């Protein structure tokens, strides 16, 4: 396994000269996420009495956000992650196109796989928070495996992810934690910095998956 610095350097080397398509994919993905979660935050404001809203409208907005996350954001997230994997492996820079192609090819399998992984994390979290977090890292490779192994069921992808992540969960946690400084800087730009941070992080995570796959 490479070091965090090596993953980040690999990501930056791949992105050099390819920031335009990476930013386009990032804008589209982040835009979709915000469009889906904004109604939820609007309901939050209403719940705290900061704005007035009818209970029925609050319920409808919550349903919209929940269904939007399940049926739109999650599968597009699968496509987004795999677009960057193909970018890191083969230099395919049509990231926006690859994102949607990956999301909607095998759409219901993507939806079911991510839902099932999230449901298992939820069940583990009912016991204690820490087991839920650990299981979340165990299932971290599911988005990649759903696309790379179409012959496997969603549950098989989850089990394979658990096996591949044995002894590597802290490595991924440490890699994610190494971006905390960039997250803080991005927040200071009212989120604009996320447009650059997201592709940088996704490319780094794809490089991590490449190593896990190679060593498994």
Positions of predicted regions on the chain:
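Hydrophobic alpha-helical membrane segments
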Residues: 1-216
